Amino acid sequence: MKHNGSRTCLNRRSRFGSRERDWLREDVKRGCVYLYGADTTTATTTTSSSSSSSSSSDLHLVLCTVETPASEICAGEGRESLYLQLHGDLVRRLEPSERPLQIVYDYLSRLGFEDPVRIQEEATNPDLSCMIRFYGEKPCQMDHLDRILLSGIYNVRKGKTQLHKWAERLVVLCGTCLIVSSVKDCQTGKMHILPLVGGKIEEVKRRQHSLAFSSAGAQAQTYHVSFETLAEYQRWQRQASKVVSQRMSTVDLSCYSLEEVPEHLFYSQDITYLNLRHNFMQLERPGGLDTLHKFSQLKGLNLSHNKLGLFPVLLCEISTLTELSLSCNGFHDLPSQIGKLLNLQTLSLDGNGLTALPDELGNLRQLTSLGISFNDFRHIPEVLEKLTMLDKVAMAGNRLEVLNLGALTRMSQVKHVDLRMNHLKTVITENMEGNKHITHMDLRDNQLTDLDLSSLCSLEQLHCERNQLRELTLSGFSLRTLYASWNRLTAVNVYPVPSLLTSLELSQNLLECVPDWACEAKKLEILDISHNLLTEVPMRILSSLSLRKLMVGHNHIHVLPALVEHIPLEVLDIQHNTLSRLPDTLFSKALNLRYLNASANSLESLPSACAGEESLSVLQLLYLTSNLLTDQCIPVLVGHPHLRVLHLANNQLQTFPASKLNKLEQLEELNLSGNKLTAIPTTIANCKRLHTLVAHANNISIFPEILQLPQIQFVDLSCNDLTEILIPEALPATLQDLDLTGNTNLVLEHKTLDMFSHITALKIDQKPLPATDSAVTSTFWSHGLAEMAGQRNKLCVSALAMDNFAEGVGAVYGMFDGDRNEELPRLLQCTMADVLLEEVQHSTNDTVFMTNTFLVSHRKLGMAGQKLGSSALLCYIRPDTADPTSSFSLTVANVGMCQAVLCRGGKPVPLSKVFSLEHDPEEAQRVKDQKAIITEDNKVNGVTCCTRLLGCTYLYPWILPKPHIASTPLTIQDELLILGNKALWEHLSYLEAVNAVRHVQDPLAAAKKLCTLAQSYGCQDNVGAMVVYLNIGEEGCTCEMNGLTLPGPVGFASTAALKDTPKPTTPSSSSGIASEFSSEMSTSEVSSEVGSTASDEHNTVGLEASLLPRPERRCSLHPASSAGVFQRQPSCATFSSNQSDNGLDSDDDQPVEGVITNGSRVEVEVDIHCCRGREPESSPPLPKNSSNACSEERARGAGFGIRRQNSVNSGILLPANRDKMELQKSPSTSCLYGKKLSNGSIVPLEDSLNLIEVATEAPKRKTGYFAAPTQLEPEDQFVVPRDLEEEVKEQMKQHQEGRPEPEPRGEERTEPLEEFDTAL
């Protein structure tokens, strides 16, 4: 069999044969390449393996090895060339010597896969085509072609008069010109060129689908063109309108995968700026870069990101160039001919491998801006001293270790110097001569310990954040702005006093006092000196007549000085200090104060808002969370009639006087959570502008009158004592989120739920099942989740919580933050647990299965993950098999900026790594080595500050999905686990978060408290927090038979009988041991929508894997039996998200008990993943004395009941001795596979597993699934008529007499009834 170059066509019914699988297994260097055909109707930017428009004949499977070159595959396929597309983006031609399979293997290896066998398996997965794909022909997208060139044979008439006749001519619109041939369908004759820039395009009314093209100028020419169809007319009008509207002759051909300049573009001789960035331009070929000199008026040329490798020397012949960009092309040197570009003013060479510049560069006397950032320079090139007009030098991301100020002094005209992200450790001053021309300097992210720039007497702005500075010395003659945060500064010296200074940022340092010179700065408007060691605020600072914004939070300030005179202060942040009171004259003297944050202090009272009868306060935002305020402070708030935001959470409020709340008419957001309030005043109805009310964790028993407010949007009354809701006849249309969880006594009728049908998010508790019917839940952990949108209009944070996972003794918790997108967090929320469940059965090594879980989830994002990205955090608790002294181990993996913190013995233990450029120097260096461009706002290519994410595949190899992994055994000292997104940890320290929730009994209230604290401390973004309470005892046994006394030969079959029981040969659909080699792949799998795998169940396992029984985990007290049993393992998951529009719509219309589908979406806690007990697949018939034997077993405490899995909400119990033949008729036992839905999702057929699908039958909302109580309609209850009562009692009596003896009570029964959730 010939494998290299052989072709196998895959269609929706053909399969990956056993012969091919056997051949692949023989050597890991063998594999297959999916070869796609070109389809001009399919967009290259959105193509994927899920593209339904690609016919089966366009997809071929080529078996090859890592040594097979592209030329050999082309020969076998009858192709001229192969093309490679990465991440649905650009398409480049492969060189004949390149090896496609090796390219795939290298790609997977760089993503994070290490095992060669796993790399071979992943390479055969058709879903990979969303990230890397091969074409036999170059694909073209029609709208791309339209923007490059429009052509066709149309009826044309020259001139505005009707003297000329209509004639068919070849018409081309390319670049800035309209080209009309003199002969029909011929380009060899004379071509008439009509420049369109500055001209006009008009509709010809007398002729249908006709346009009049006119050039600019006094002697303008006009051509009338008649099109055959409306679509052609619109295409030409749209493209021509862009050309005529330009002021300059600019042509943008970026991101078109071009290898050469279109031939007709050379007719546009008036082009002044040509953009060819992000293409694959060739040097020597017709239309290549060597022909660009034909544009005689070209002034600007952008050739960045073309992977040229060598500098195009012929570009130096274009003497008219004033702007040239050649960034990210892999240059290692520049030719001497570059000195010919005498008119060049701007030269960008960023992202290459340059180590030196030629001396001829000094000839460019007109050069004003030079960009050589992210190269390999170790010193400032001397040739720059010859550039007398040079104004800006950008050398960020190089390898400079020493900064010689003398070299900068010799550059007489340089004003802006960018040296951030180098390796600077020392600054050398050659002489005392001052430098009078440098005004802006950026030294961020270096390794400086001391910095003396006093010789730069004209310095206006300095950035030196994130160094290791202990002392900073500057000249104050011209200083206007200073940014020196995130250092170790103990002294900042500026002389003379900076009279022009307007902004000063010194946060995150070790300063013990405000510098004296700062107190004397007469124009200082902004001062941020938070996160230092201050003990006081100087009177001169607080009484400054120029200061408008003062940030002194997170210090040790005990008291603020009293104000004597009026001050212009507008923003005051004094949070996290030790203040017991505020100055009495604060509000009366600071009449411009609009924002005050005094949270996390020890305030017991507030100063009066006015000295006289009338208040002049303009205060709008007031944050007083976590103080010692009582009811006595409420009357003072009335003096601030313009308050819009008021936070009084976590104080000691017991009442809120109705008369006082009535006067806060401008109030828009009110947070009263964490107090001791029993009611919200009825006068809240007068706050007509109120849109947010947060009052969780109080003692409120009466629902406030907030549903009459016209603008109310968000209401959080969770963790209170509500018993009922009084709602008006009509609810406000603006209401989006109503949280009533944690109100254990609250019962909502169906009529009430119907009235909330329009609410995006209705959060209520699920009605608990009776104690005798409830399933066995974990006593080792419980969780609470809170998510708040903040000031943004959508929630881009989702969470995953499974208290019972896999075998029922594990748990999985996750947090996903999409920053600005909400799609990816929801996809990860729905898929990642399934991927983990599959991966833990492939490997027991935590590093391996966690890494593979993230990488596979990255792949499953499909097209959605090409341009979007998300931070991800996953925590997996499982039995610890490696450490016999520990019951459970915790494995945490993360990418991005979501973090997990473990509270151990009252102290925080961080388990995550922050993958950002600012916090991880190693990752920043990796990104720099890959020659990425890091913009001044510290973002990779201006997109994200994270270096590792799930998604954002188009930023490969700079952004990777490989996670950081940490494992630790859980001990009795581990109290809780906190998961939070970026916004949470930006505003709360690890220690404060742990201390805030350690003594909160309810995990839901704890999570809510963390989010409230973050918002009160200044967070305006989405914030998400999950708190997992741990109860890991030393006596905890984690084996599968813990707490279960095995029944004797009556309760279950005997051991001998079990040995004879045949093992199941049908694999479980949830066992997760899926392989591309052991399972059959069809084209339907290849063509399935990768982006719609949000609810995919685990793949069908191979036959070989299914025959291997999984050994049961037992301890020495509960030895394993000699016979294995089989059971499908669902899980119990609680999903929380902000929208259910994630591809999970179900085809099943069967109603489910306990789920209210009244038009609004509700959150439902469902069992879909974990098993809580085991059951034999079959057992022999019971002996005749089975009833007596069962009674004896119950007397010994070994009795138990099995709850039907397909009646999880009804709580029906089946006795263990029920006839098995009846059970086998259940769909949940007779079918082990899932049901294929129309969207490609796989769901099992059990009712309990369809709960999540039924929940999504509700109209699509923005906030996911929420817990709804299970309530029976009154008419559904069983009612016995009076005339039949006696007859029914007699029948029940006879039925009881026919039953076995009841179980003994009291001391005879020592153990409670055990109950297990099984697949039955």
From Swiss-Prot:
Kindly indicate whether the keyword Membrane belongs to this entry: yes
Q: Where would you find this protein in the cell?
A: Cytoplasm; Membrane; Nucleus
Q: What class of enzyme is it?
A: hydrolase
UniProt feature coiled coil, ranges: none
Q: How is the cofactor bound?
A: Binds 2 manganese ions per subunit. Mn(2+) is inhibitory below pH 8 and activating above pH 8.
GO MF, one term, reads: protein serine/threonine phosphatase activity
In the record for this protein, the LRR repeats are positioned at: 247-268, 270-293, 297-318, 320-341, 343-364, 366-388, 389-409, 413-434, 437-457, 458-477, 478-499, 500-521, 523-544, 546-567, 568-589, 592-613, 618-641, 642-663, 666-687, 689-710, 711-732, 734-755
**Expression across tissues:** Expressed in the retina.
- In short, the EC number is 3.1.3.16
User: What segments bear the compositional bias annotation Basic and acidic residues?
Assistant: 1289-1312
Low complexity: which segments have biased composition? Answer: 1066-1094
The residues that hold Mn(2+) 2 are 817, 982, 1021
Keyword annotations: Cytoplasm, Hydrolase, Leucine-rich repeat, Manganese, Membrane, Metal-binding, Nucleus, Phosphoprotein, Protein phosphatase, Repeat, Tumor suppressor
Q: What does this protein do?
A: Protein phosphatase involved in regulation of Akt and PKC signaling. Mediates dephosphorylation in the C-terminal domain hydrophobic motif of members of the AGC Ser/Thr protein kinase family; specifically acts on 'Ser-473' of AKT1, 'Ser-660' of PRKCB isoform beta-II and 'Ser-657' of PRKCA. Akt regulates the balance between cell survival and apoptosis through a cascade that primarily alters the function of transcription factors that regulate pro- and antiapoptotic genes. Dephosphorylation of 'Ser-473' of Akt triggers apoptosis and decreases cell proliferation.
Q: Quaternary structure?
A: Interacts with AKT1, AKT3 and PRKCB. Interacts with STK4, RPS6KB1, RAF1. Interacts with FKBP5; FKBP5 acts as a scaffold for PHLPP2 and Akt. Interacts with NHERF1; NHERF1 scaffolds a heterotrimeric complex with PTEN.
Q: What is this protein called?
A: PH domain leucine-rich repeat-containing protein phosphatase 2
Name the source organism. Mus musculus
Gene expressing this chain? Phlpp2
